[in-house]
Amino acid sequence: MALPNQQTVDYPSFKLVIVGDGGTGKTTFVKRHLTGEFEKKYEPTIGVEVHPLDFFTNCGKIRFYCWDTAGQEKFGGLRDGYYIHGQCAIIMFDVTARLTYKNVPTWHRDLCRVCENIPIVLCGNKVDVKNRQVKAKQVTFHRKKNLQYYEISAKSNYNFEKPFLYLARKLAGDANLHFVESPALAPPEVQIDIALQQRHENEILEAANQPLPDDDDDAFE
C-alpha cells in the first residue's frame, strides 16, 4: 500500500509493517536497503516513514512498502492507522535486551487485533554483539504462534534478505520463489563472528525439537 502522494508501481507491492520496542534496530534495518532509503516518504499525519524496498525474484520484481514508526512507539502504543491494510509484518527485538523480547507478545497482539491473518516474521536483531542476553534456545514465542524466526544483524547485513524472502513466498503462495539478484545494501558497519552465530543457529534447530515450555516467554535464568 503506497501513501496518497507516492507513485504506484505496475508490479506486486505489499504493505509491510515493522514493529517492536524502540531501540531494537528497526530503522537501521530498513535503511540498509539503499534505494528504499533514497526513495522514502514521510507521512506526518501518521508519523511514519515509508521505504519502498524492491526485490528481484524468479517471478519478477516485487515491492515492500516498509512502514517504519520513526520512534513513536517510545511514547506509547501505535495508532491503528499504522497497522490498517498491513499485508505482512516483522516484529523485532534486541537479543542484548531481555525486555524487548518480553514485549514481543504485546506487539503480536496489537498487530493481530488489526491485521488478523497475515504472515509475520520474528527477528532477533544485534546478534553481532557479544553480550547476548536472550539466548537462542530461549526464543520460543514464534513456535507458539506459528511465526517464522530469524536471527539478524542489521549493521553487518547478516540474514538481511531472509525475512523478505519468507514473506514474499507466503504472499505469492510459492515456496520455490527465490531472489535472483541482491539489492544494493549499505556496506557492513560491523563484522559478525560467523562460527559463533552458527552455534546459535544450531541451538535454534535443536530447541525446535524440544517440547515447548509452559511459561510465558519471560522465564529467563
UniProtKB/Swiss-Prot annotation:
Residues 10-174 form the Small GTPase Ran-type domain. SUPFAM superfamilies: P-loop containing nucleoside triphosphate hydrolases. This is GTP-binding nuclear protein Ran/TC4. NCBIfam families: small_GTP (TIGR00231). Keywords: GTP-binding, Nucleotide-binding, Nucleus, Protein transport, Transport. It is found in: Nucleus. Its main location: nucleus. InterPro entries: P-loop_NTPase (IPR027417), Ran_GTPase (IPR002041), Small_GTP-bd (IPR005225), Small_GTPase (IPR001806). Found in a nuclear export complex with RanGTP, exportin and pre-miRNA.
